[in-house]
Each structure stands twice: as structure tokens, then as C-alpha cells.
Curated annotation (Swiss-Prot):
Entry protein name: CTP synthase
GO molecular function term, any single one: glutaminase activity
Keywords attached to this entry: ATP-binding, Glutamine amidotransferase, Ligase, Magnesium, Metal-binding, Nucleotide-binding, Pyrimidine biosynthesis
HAMAP family linked: PyrG (MF_01227)
Residues reported in the UniProt entry to bind L-glutamine: 54, 354, 382-385, 405, 462
Gene Ontology biological process: 'de novo' CTP biosynthetic process; pyrimidine nucleobase biosynthetic process
GO CC, any one term: cytosol
Gene for this chain: pyrG
Family per record: Belongs to the CTP synthase family.
EC number(s) per entry: 6.3.4.2
Length: 532
């Protein structure tokens, strides 16, 4: 039978509940347990798929095509497991499913209420994850902050789960801010106390408190929190600021977070083996010299919009003992008159995914500059599309070449809607997930990087390359090195006589892991390091 851990947050948002949950998952897996992780978000959007990157950050895509919260990227990177749509649930999805069930008559004329109908639906998501994943421990992060009105059904649901399963099968971890007042030079525990008081009023006694702080707290601070929050002093854990988030599991290991959880859940495991994670962190600390990536994007004001891309670059850099330096370029600031000057010192250029026509011409110029000046280039999804459009304009003498996403007239549609897609709604109209086998052409850079002729990568797009232009571009020297043969969709392009010029229609950033960078990122970083 699965055991359950619930992670809540108090005082303020952005304290690192996701990293705390991920770190615990890392430790439990290192102890020999199978772990599954979930995120419950209190917003009313059905999923993050149509949310603005400026408000939500990146949309992380799972193997089975789930458009999920960016915390799932942390989960997968920390526990090195493929999660599913079941790992991300919003209040909007819960309410939609409940209302649809009522409209179908599933409730037999009952009065539909938050308790029990909404809370039962939330509990079912947790229990279903336990049943289908076969995991020993389910770790569920509750989004938002305790006290928010939107979070209350989730708090009530996990309270009921504890009642149903018993304390020996459920652990509550509360992450809260240990406030430091610079004026008086002292730490204040009152915000944590009030946050726990709020939890207690909702029927939940936390078992472990993780206090976010800049440095380790004193024995006196922990004793005070212990006294007022009804937990042993040993169950007060410091989440201190670290240079790298990947050091946090080791910090939690030193404070025995996993041991506290295992003891309460009455689980006996083998010795926790952190050797591979320690070696990874040693790589990070040994990475002194920088490598620079010029990042030409649409949403650079909020770097979380590209979280997995950034982490993938970092992870690849550590393989060469290099740390990442990013030169951020707003795509819509590049134009014909300034792009050469702006990009003249670029060591490597990356154009990531995105939607809409803003900044497209700037991205096209960035890919053109990389192509013509032998600068390593990696284009992801949109970045692959604009690179192909740029080549078509120059090599086929088609100045009107474009995508129907940006030029609705479709005069020269190098990219067009994926066949069979209904475009009436934005939500649910994308090609999603890793269901599509990419067959890689023999003797190409892609084959060398992957070491395989077949790969499965994750997608998130609604436009595809128009094969009417394939032969003409091949004759000019563009190599279509990866194809989804079933529907003849182009997945990878590359230039053979270039240090590194590769574009993928899929998103390789979603499968990079510590100690296992995605091959495209590793090849891109290696090209930057070696390109003189």
C-alpha cells in the first residue's frame, strides 16, 4: 500500500515548496523506494497550456502529453522518473470535471457542494495516482499559500486523507519563511507560528516544518518553533539558500529529512545512497570557467518561461566543467540595422520555443547570423521553424517565406497547420507528448549525438514543415536528419558543413537530467566550448 506526503506552504509564496518536495523525492528514491509526485494548483485554469508565460512561467510537457506546471520539471530532474498528466491537477480541472459529471446526471440529482464533491474529487486524484503508479510513496505539493481561499478545498481533502489512512501512512510537511529583520538584527518566528495556527484551524497539524532562511538557525529558534508549533525540535528543518538548487537534497540529507519521513511512515529501507548525486554536485563546484549562450527569446523578462532550457544548458555545461552565462536578447529588439552589431560577440545562439508573431523577424536574423558566421546554433520548436524559414528565404530566393502562424495569407507557407488539427480553440489543439518516433538519418550529426537511429522526444506545437519545399531545400544543402515516418513530419534539421547548426521540432529540454543531459544540449555546449 502506498504512503502519502503532503507539502504545504505558508507566509508567502515562492519559498521553494517544489524544491523541498523534489529533494525529499530524491532522498526517498536514493533509499530504494519508488516515488511518484503530484502538484495541485488552486487556480481556475483547466491547465497551464493557455496561460501567459509572463504569469506562469514555462509549460512543462510530460511523456503522455500533459501540459503541466513548471515544478514538474524540477520533480523529473530530481527523481529521474517520467511523470504523467496525473501529476498536475488544477482547481479548474477539478471543478470542470465535477460540473460535467453533474450535467451528465452522474450525481443522481444531488446538491453539488465543495464538501464532499470537490474534496472527494481531489482525494480521488491522489488515490488514483497511488493505484496506477505503483509507487511506495506519493508526494503531493499543494500550490498557493495556507489561508488563501482558493486552497481551502485542497487542505480539507488532505485532512480527510489523513483521517482515512492514519498518521502512520500520511506525513504533513509545512514550508514557511523564517523572517529576518535587518533593523533589529534578529530572526522572527511569529510568521511561522501564525501560519501553523492557520493550518491548525483547518484541522492539520504539520509533522515537519521546513523553514526557509538564509543560514542555519540557532537551537533557540528551533526550540521556540517546536514549542509553539507542537512538533519535536528535530522536526524543524532549515532550507538555507544554496548556490545551486541541486545542493538542496544533500542539505536535507544532512538534516535527516528523509529519516523523519521514513520513521513516521514506518518504512524500513536500505541505506540512502547519495553517491551519484554527490558526484554531480562536485561537477557543479568544479565548473569555474564560463561558456556563454546568446539567448534570443520572446519572454526573457521572466526567465522561468524558459526554466527547463536554462537547466538543460547548465546540466550540459557541467559535463565540460563549465558554468552557464546567458546573454539575454529580446527578439523584437533585433532588426536589419542592428543585428550584426548586437550579435557580433556571440559564442553560441539559442532560439527557444514560443507562440505568436512578435519578435519573429528578430529570431530569423539571429539564426541567419549564426548560419553565416559559423556560430553554434540550437533552435527549439519555433527556433527550428524560423531557422528553416530563414534558409528558404535566402537559398530558395523566397523573401515571402513564412509560417501561416505569422502570415495568415499563406503566400509561401514553409510551415502550416498540422493536418487534422482543429484550430477553433487554443486549448487542446497541440501535438503533445513523446508518442512520435523520430527516425534519424544515417551519418548525420543527429545520429552521432544520439548514438541511435530512433528517438522519442516531447512535442508541443501546432504547425509542421510543409513538405512541398523539402526537395528544393535538400538540393541546396539543408539536411532533414529526423523524420516522423508515419506522417512524414520533419523533426530535425541540420547543416552538415557548420560547427553546429541544429533545429528540433520537439523540445529536448524536457528530457535533460542531472548527469544525463539531452544529446542536443550536450552537442551544442560542446560546440561552443570547442569553437574558436
Amino acid at each position: 500500500m502506498a504512503k502519502f506526503v503532503f507539502v504545504t506552504g505558508g507566509v508567502v509564496s515562492g519559498l521553494g515548496k517544489g524544491i523541498t518536495a523534489s529533494s525529499l523525492g530524491n532522498l526517498l528514491k536514493a533509499s530504494g523506494l519508488k516515488v511518484f509526485m503530484q502538484k495541485f494548483d488552486p487556480y481556475l485554469n483547466v491547465d497551464p497550456g493557455t496561460m501567459s508565460p509572463y504569469q506562469h512561467g514555462e509549460v512543462f510537457v510530460t511523456d503522455d502529453g500533459g501540459e503541466t506546471d513548471l515544478d514538474l520539471g524540477h520533480y523529473e530532474r530530481f527523481i529521474d522518473e517520467k511523470l504523467t498528466k496525473m501529476s498536475s491537477t488544477s482547481a479548474g480541472k477539478i471543478y470542470l470535471e465535477t460540473i460535467n459529471a453533474e450535467r451528465r446526471g452522474d450525481w443522481g440529482g444531488q446538491t453539488i457542494q465543495v464538501v464532499p464533491h470537490i474534496t472527494d474529487s481531489i482525494k480521488n486524484k491522489v488515490y488514483q495516482a497511488a493505484k496506477t503508479s505503483g509507487a511506495d510513496v506519493i508526494i503531493s505539493e499543494i500550490g498557493g499559500t495556507v489561508g488563501d481561499i482558493e486552497s481551502q478545498p485542497f487542505i480539507e481533502a488532505i485532512r480527510q486523507i489523513r483521517m482515512e489512512q492514519g498518521k502512520e501512512n500520511v506525513v504533513f510537511i509545512h514550508v514557511a519563511l523564517l523572517l529576518y529583520l535587518n533593523a533589529s538584527k534578529e530572526y522572527k518566528t511569529k510568521p511561522i507560528q501564525m501560519s501553523v495556527k492557520e493550518l491548525l484551524s483547518l484541522g492539520i497539524q504539520p509533522d515537519i516544518i521546513v523553514q526557509r532562511t538564509d543560514k542555519h538557525s540557532s537551537k533557540e529558534i528551533k526550540e521556540k518553533i517546536s514549542l509553539f508549533c507542537n512538533i519535536p525540535t528535530s522536526n524543524v528543518i532549515d532550507a538555507i539558500d544554496k548556490e545551486s538548487i541541486y545542493e538542496v537534497p544533500l542539505e536535507m540529507y544532512e538534516q535527516n529529512l528523509h529519516g523523519l519521513v521514513l520513521d513516521q511512515l514506518q518504512i524500513r529501507t536500505k541505506k540512502t545512497d547519495m553517491e551519484s548525486w554527490i558526484k554531480f554536485c562536485e561537477k557543479i563546484k568544479a565548473s569555474k570557467e564560463e561558456f556563454e549562450v546568446t539567448f534570443v527569446g520572446k519572454y526573457i523578462e521572466l526567465q522561468d518561461a524558459y526554466l527547463s532550457v536554462i537547466e538543460s544548458l547548465k546540466i550540459a555545461g557541467y559535463e565540460f566543467k563549465r558554468k552557464l552565462k546567458i546573454n539575454w536578447i529580446q527578439a523584437d529588439k533585433l532588426n536589419e540595422s542592428n543585428y550584426k552589431e548586437v550579435l557580433q560577440n556571440a559564442k553560441g545562439i539559442l532560439v527557444p520555443g514560443g507562440f505568436g508573431d512578435r519578435g519573429i523577424e528578430g529570431m530569423i536574423l539571429a539564426s541567419k547570423f549564426a548560419r553565416e558566421n559559423s556560430i553554434p546554433y540550437l533552435g527549439i520548436c519555433l527556433g527550428m521553424q524560423i531557422a528553416t524559414i530563414s534558409i528558404a528565404r535566402d537559398w530558395l530566393n523566397l523573401p515571402e517565406a513564412n509560417s501561416t502562424e505569422f502570415d495568415h495569407s499563406g503566400a509561401v507557407p514553409i510551415f502550416d497547420f498540422i493536418r487534422g488539427i482543429d484550430v477553433q480553440n487554443l486549448g487542446g489543439t497541440l501535438r503533445l507528448g513523446a508518442f512520435y518516433k523520430t527516425t534519424i538519418k544515417e551519418g548525420t550529426k543527429a545520429e552521432k549525438l544520439y548514438g541511435s537511429r530512433e528517438v522519442f522526444e516531447r512535442h508541443r506545437h501546432r504547425y509542421e514543415f510543409n513538405n512541398e519545399y523539402k526537395k528544393a531545400l535538400e538540393e541546396k544543402g539543408l539536411v532533414f536528419s529526423g523524420i516522423y515516418e508515419e506522417k512524414k513530419l520533419v523533426e530535425i534539421i541540420e547543416l552538415p558543413n557548420h560547427p553546429f547548426f541544429v533545429g528540433s521540432q520537439y523540445h529536448p529540454e524536457f528530457t535533460s537530467r542531472p548527469n544525463k543531459p539531452n544529446p542536443l544540449f550536450k552537442g551544442f555546449v560542446e560546440a561552443i566550448v570547442n569553437n574558436k
